[in-house]
Amino acid sequence: MTRPCDILIQAACIVTQDAMRTVVEDGALAVADGTVLAVGPREAVTAAHAPARLLDLGNALVMPGLVNAHTHAAMTFLRGVADDLPLMDWLTQHIFPVEKHLTPDIVEAGALLGCAEMLRTGTTAFNDMYLIQDATYRAVDTAGLRCLGGEGIFGFPSPAYPDADAGLDLVRRLHETWRHNPRIRQCVTPHAVYTTSPELLQRCQALAEELDLPLHIHLAETTTETAQCQQMFGQRPVPYCHGLGLLTPRATVAHAVDLTDDEMDLLASTGAAVAHNPESNMKLASGAAPVPQMLARGIAVGIGTDGAASNNSLNMFTEMTSCAMLHKLRCMDPTCAPAQTVLDMATLGGAAALHWPGLGQLAPGCPADLTVLDLSAPNLQPMYNPASHLVYAATGHEVRLTMVAGEVLYQDGRFTRFDYPALMAQMRDVRRWVLDKLGR
């Protein structure tokens, strides 16, 4: 007797990222009610299911949607506005001066462009921190991805609130407004140790505990940050945040570049996750996070792109390549950061960084969030080891289809939920707005 399902996907290869890292050649995947019903050999899965829709993808590879562990989606509107600068100069001289004029329309347009870029390159979920976050959520709701997001909390006025008290109240309102949306989850996001006070960080942690939300913070990104933290508070960033109670299993720390061995041990003992951003860290010369050492300690590490203003893309395929290459060079060891480990970071590690169980794998009961690559692309042939190709050969431009909760959001150059040409016209207006604010 066959079992009904909404969609039956057939493909030459399915990379499941399940507990056994099963790869199915000539496989099929059944989807019902937005979740994976079954995955396995084409003949067996097809015979066992009666689909409302059949997607025979032919010579294609199906894999879990990639999970971007740290980004600022709306900052696509600042892509390329300032490059080749240290982090603090980049922030204070170019980014903050524009951001103080932000409007909801600018943020929503930038975030929708970010969602388009992520869908086009196989990302189905992302961890976001920015300003006027309600506008980002509207873009996410339009595009259909999953997002764990939070309003950036500062110890000074932002475009979204006049003071920290109002900022924390805004987090409460955002949580109440969006908590019934199955694809949008809220977190508490103090920006960094150098933009907040000890009291404010403790209030953020208390709010995260009260609302039972994750906490997401930039931490130990540069040696400059470390020096500032020592000068201001008498401690390095990681022990400083630990002393304030921020480092718990609900925390995700972005960057974690400037770490000592003792600080890695401390992170491991707290259960906090790390979002590693190799390309942004390289471009800003922030340093290389000691990822192999963190993984050896059992720390959950995901891969993030950071914002397109500092990367300058949201492409997780190129981020995986950069991650693998960076750590081989940093360690002077070609066995360091092997392909399967990096793929795990971009899928299962991202799920851990988003505190969202079930993401990053295609197994029965997990969300049907997936992406499909065209195996006819010359750079993906011949294929001996799918993980190798996904990390070292794929560029993201082989993506044919991206699906979230069983819904096709992107296929063969077309976005199913929004008018992409209209968005391009809007971005031309946004560019003129940015140039005006910069006086160019």
From Swiss-Prot:
Documented EC number(s): 3.5.4.28, 3.5.4.31
Keywords: Hydrolase, Metal-binding, Zinc
Cysteine disulfide links: none
Catalytic activity: S-adenosyl-L-homocysteine + H2O + H(+) = S-inosyl-L-homocysteine + NH4(+); S-methyl-5'-thioadenosine + H2O + H(+) = S-methyl-5'-thioinosine + NH4(+)
Molecular-function GO term, any one: 5'-methylthioadenosine deaminase activity
Gene3D superfamilies xref list: Metal-dependent hydrolases (3.20.20.140), Urease, subunit C, domain 1 (2.30.40.10)
The organism's place on the tree of life at top rank: Bacteria
Chain positions recorded as substrate binding sites: 99, 191, 221, 306
UniProt cofactor note: Binds 1 zinc ion per subunit.
List of residues binding Zn(2+): 70, 72, 218, 306
Cofactors that this protein relies on: Zn(2+)
The family this protein is said to belong to: Belongs to the metallo-dependent hydrolases superfamily. MTA/SAH deaminase family.
Its job: Catalyzes the deamination of 5-methylthioadenosine and S-adenosyl-L-homocysteine into 5-methylthioinosine and S-inosyl-L-homocysteine, respectively. Is also able to deaminate adenosine.
Protein name, per record: 5-methylthioadenosine/S-adenosylhomocysteine deaminase
Higher taxonomy: Bacteria, Pseudomonadati, Thermodesulfobacteriota, Desulfovibrionia, Desulfovibrionales
